[in-house]
Amino acid sequence: MPSPTTRHLVLTFGFAVAALPAVAADGKAVYDKTCVACHASGVANAPKLGDKAAWAPRVATGKDALFGAVVKGKGAMPPKAGAADLKDDDIMAAIDYMLTAAK
């Protein structure tokens, strides 16, 4: 039988874990669900995933500028890529995934 101290630690740890914010979605999962339709083929001038030359000028603007472009929309891309329920953490995860592929 666990000691009262052990039970207290387990309960405390359990509450601490439950209080953590939800982990942002995997960037690839967000890309596959929301971004792939345009960024896989380059539709409407969208830079293709992994195309270093196409991504270079966007990389130069920085992640904050890319985030703003996704949130507000840019060119043919609607705000939040048409996924109004997309969370900021998910957007950043997708940006990180696409930038990593462009290196």
What label would you give each PLM region?
Residues 47-48, 56, 68-93, 98-102:
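Axial heme c-ligation environment in periplasmic c-type cytochrome domains
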Residues 25-34:
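Local sequence-structure signature of Cys/Sec-based thiol-disulfide redox active-site neighborhoods
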Residues 4, 41-56:
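His/Cys-centered metal/cofactor-coordination and adjacent catalytic loops
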Residues 11-12, 22:
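Cleavable N-terminal signal peptides
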Residues 35-41, 94:
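The canonical Cys-X-X-Cys-His
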Residues 1-11:
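Bacterial N-terminal signal peptides that target proteins for export
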Residues 18-25:
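Sec/Tat signal peptide C-region and signal peptidase I cleavage site
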